[in-house]
Structure formats: structure tokens, C-alpha cells
Curated annotation (Swiss-Prot):
Belongs to the xylose isomerase family. Mg(2+) 1 binds at E232, E268, D296, D339. One of its GO terms (molecular function) is xylose isomerase activity. Keywords: Carbohydrate metabolism, Cytoplasm, Isomerase, Magnesium, Metal-binding, Xylose metabolism. The lineage of its organism: Bacteria, Pseudomonadati, Pseudomonadota, Gammaproteobacteria, Enterobacterales. This is Xylose isomerase. It comes from Escherichia coli (strain K12).
Length: 440
């Protein structure tokens, strides 16, 4: 079959002096960073949905893209053509991984039977493509939010029959992910929330969602899936309020239902923006809570109240994110999935490459800067100094539960404590970060 991207062989690393827009300037897969290949640090993935499923439509306009697999025709044949183009793209872009929702890769059909049969056929197609190309599945998931049946949610739906349909999709998608060697399975509660409290039983919906997640964990162990289960937090959109609001909220939910050892987090930059947090904050929080799993790398727009899903282009922001990830030991089963789409006006098919190339270069440069911060160790040293008092006898007695509140009150009076505030030196530390970013 003729190549879709027929004007491009492969995207290659040409160095920072290159002016070729279809070449990497900073992402060199084989470059060693802290003793590990850059490709192994970053574990890039391209997503199926924004890249090959979105037709350019928005709330104010119809589809703007002319993709051959989005034209009228036999659904399975079009899905197979889409897979041809997707794996051509993955190969030419040099991404080692990809991600999908079930209905991204397979026609949903008019019944559960059709859904299952179509998906089974496409899983065989994807398995062949993976073997042919060497591209692997970072994670799979089920789309339990687009179909009108999920208007009131999937796991939190007031109708147990809808709950059961969603369970069927998750079983099918997880087993497909397992068969394809996927390293993670993601759960994003697109409509697991509410529009108004006037028709919502919060306790009931929370119990339903908790039981659904428990069943997901049970099924994972039943089929022998060794990958990581991931929840992707988001505060709102499409619902007014979603139950997986942010990393800290999800932690409380997992603790309530005894799932904190079973499920980790897939953190998306744009979702952090919508929650009123920085991307850095959500990554650091997930790590501090022991829940860090994977990343959807993109960016939002602080002036807009919706999920713009733009490609990441801020080295400053992502250097701090990569610094946290490196300090935590790096990715295990997770990676950097580009949950991002070209703009509606970007109608040339090669715009898909420009978006991903810029994002990959951004993350590569961020990685190298983060590595310099790790090697220098100055930020860690400053934090250690700031909290050094907790290594004293008093600090350790407090942390080990050897002092009560009354004991501390007595200690403070007997020792005539009069502590003096020590400067946090925020401005100096911000200057230090700029040194790593901009001084060669």
C-alpha cells in the first residue's frame, strides 16, 4: 500500500544547528543522560485519538481535516487503513510506544457482540503491526464517555445496566491491552462526576465508582496482567465536577476503597491547569504520595477554561517536571504520551510531525537540563539544609511519636524556645534554576 506520508523517510536527529523542520534538534535517542539512553528515559508515545481520530471539528465548526480513513466506507476497512497510517507515523517519528482507546482503533458497532467481534479483529491487526514495526503499546483504555449511553457517567451511572456495559468494555479493552503486551491500563472517568447536585446522590455514586475500581483490580489479577493500573485525574469537562479532581483527591478515594497499593496515576499537564495547579505540583504530589505512574505530556492555556491539549513547548516548565521524575528514579512502566492535537487550522498532514517533533525536542532538552540539576545537587542541598532541624533529637522524637502535644508545650517552656524565621531564599533559587536553563 502506498505510504500516506510519502514525502518523508524518517525523522532523524540532526543537532541544534539544523534548520530542517522535519528533524530533531535535541532528541537523540542514543545520547546517554545520567548513564541511560535518552529514549529509555523519555519513553515517548503517540496517541491514537488526537492524531488519527479527531477530524478537526469543534463546538463551532465541522471537521476541517481531509483524512482518507475518515471518509464514508466500510468501517473495518477504514479502521485497518487508519492502522496502516498510524504505524507508518510511529515508525517515521521514531516513537517506541503508542496508546489507544478501544473505539479509536475499532468500530464500536451497533451491539455489544459487534463491538467485541470488531475489536478482536483489530487487536490481531495491531499485534501484526507491532511485530512488524517494533513499536509497543504503552497503555490501552476504554472510551466510556462518548456514547450517549454514558451521558450520566459509566461507573457512576444511575442505571446498573449502563454500569454493566462499561464493565464489558473495560474487560475487553484490558484483555486486549494484555494480549498486545501493554505496560499499563488507564482509567479516565470522563463523565464520572455530576452536572448538578439536585439529581445526584454523592455517596451512592462514590460507592459505585469504588466498587467498579475494585472489580478492575480483581480482573487484572484474574487474567495475569502484570502492567500498572492508572487513574488520570481531571477536575471538570465534560462534567461540572469530576470525582478524580486531582492527584490528592484520587489518593483519598483510593485510600477509602483500599486501592492505594493497586492503582497509580497518569498525570496530564492540561488537567493540572484546569485544577488550578501547576504541572510541576501534580507530578511532585503524585510522587510524594507514592502514586506516580505515567504522564500525558501536553499543555493548556491558563486564559481558557477548557482542555486545549496543545503540544508541550515550555522547556522551563518541563525541566522542573523531569527533575522531579529523575529524582524519583524515572519511569518504570510509564512514559511520556503526547495527548496533544494540532490546531484546527493546521490542515497539512505533515503538521502532525511538526507538533510531535517540537514536543519531543522540548522534553529532550528538559531532560538534559534536569540531569544537570541532579548532577549539581544544589537544589537538593538547599532543601536538606532547610529541613535539617528535623534530624535533631527533638525533630526525631516528634516524628517517631515519642513526644505528645503536652510534652512539646513543656519542652518549649523549659528550654525558653524563641525560634527565628530563616529566609526561604525563593528569589535566589529561582535565579539558580534560570542558571541551569539558560547558562551553557
Amino acid at each position: 500500500m502506498q505510504a500516506y506520508f510519502d514525502q518523508l523517510d524518517r525523522v532523524r536527529y540532526e543537532g541544534s544547528k539544523s534548520s530542517n523542520p522535519l528533524a530533531f534538534r535535541h532528541y537523540n535517542p542514543d545520547e546517554l543522560v545520567l548513564g541511560k539512553r535518552m529514549e529509555e528515559h523519555l519513553r515517548f508515545a503517540a496517541c491514537y485519538w488526537h492524531t488519527f481520530c479527531w477530524n478537526g471539528a469543534d463546538m463551532f465548526g465541522v471537521g476541517a481535516f481531509n483524512r482518507p480513513w475518515q471518509q464514508p466506507g466500510e468501517a473495518l476497512a477504514l479502521a485497518k487503513r487508519k492502522a496502516d497510517v498510524a504505524f507508518e507515523f510511529f515508525h517515521k517519528l521514531h516513537v517506541p510506544f503508542y496508546c489507544f482507546h478501544d473505539v479509536d482503533v475499532s468500530p464500536e458497532g451497533a451491539s455489544l457482540k459487534e463491538y467485541i467481534n470488531n475489536f478482536a479483529q483489530m487487536v490481531d491487526v495491531l499485534a501484526g503491526k507491532q511485530e512488524e514495526s517494533g513499536v509497543k503499546l504503552l497503555w490501552g483504555t476504554a472510551n466510556c464517555f462518548t456514547n450517549p449511553r454514558y451521558g450520566a457517567g459509566a461507573a457512576t451511572n444511575p442505571d446498573p445496566e449502563v454500569f454493566s456495559w462499561a464493565a464489558t468494555q473495560v474487560v475487553t479493552a484490558m484483555e486486549a491491552t494484555h494480549k498486545l503486551g501493554g505496560e499499563n491500563y488507564v482509567l479516565w472517568g470522563g463523565r464520572e462526576g455530576y452536572e448538578t447536585l439536585l439529581n445526584t446522590d454523592l455517596r451512592q455514586e462514590r460507592e459505585q465508582l469504588g466498587r467498579f475500581m475494585q472489580m478492575v483490580v480483581e480482573h487484572k489479577h484474574k487474567i495475569g496482567f502484570q502492567g500498572t493500573l492508572l487513574i488520570e485525574p481531571k477536575p471538570q469537562e465534560p462534567t461540572k465536577h469530576q470525582y478524580d479532581y486531582d492527584a490528592a483527591t484520587v489518593y483519598g478515594f483510593l485510600k477509602q476503597f483500599g486501592l492505594e497499593k493497586e492503582i497509580k496515576l497518569n498525570i496530564e499537564a492540561n488537567h493540572a491547569t484546569l485544577a488550578g495547579h501547576s504541572f510541576h505540583h501534580e507530578i511532585a504530589t503524585a510522587i510524594a504520595l507514592g502514586l506516580f505512574g505515567s504522564v500525558d505530556a501536553n499543555r493548556g492555556d491558563a486564559q481558557l477554561g477548557w482542555d486545549t491539549d496543545q503540544f508541550p513547548n515550555s522547556v522551563e516548565e518541563n525541566a522542573l517536571v523531569m527533575y522531579e521524575i529523575l529524582k524519583a528514579g524515572g519511569f518504570t512502566t510509564g512514559g511520556l504520551n503526547f495527548d496533544a492535537k494540532v490546531r484546527r487550522q493546521s490542515t497539512d498532514k505533515y503538521d502532525l510531525f511538526y507538533g510531535h517533533i517540537g514536543a519531543m525536542d522540548t522534553m529532550a532538552l528538559a531532560l538534559k537540563i534536569a540531569a544537570r540539576m541532579i548532577e549539581d545537587g544544589e537544589l537538593d542541598k538547599r532543601i536538606a539544609q532547610r529541613y535539617s532541624g528535623w534530624n535533631s533529637e527533638l525533630g526525631q522524637q516528634i516524628l517517631k511519636g515519642q513526644m505528645s502535644l503536652a510534652d512539646l508545650a513543656k519542652y518549649a517552656q523549659e528550654h525558653h524556645l524563641s525560634p527565628v524565621h530563616q529566609s526561604g531564599r525563593q528569589e535566589q533559587l529561582e535565579n539558580l534554576v534560570n542558571h541551569y536553563l539558560f547558562d551553557k
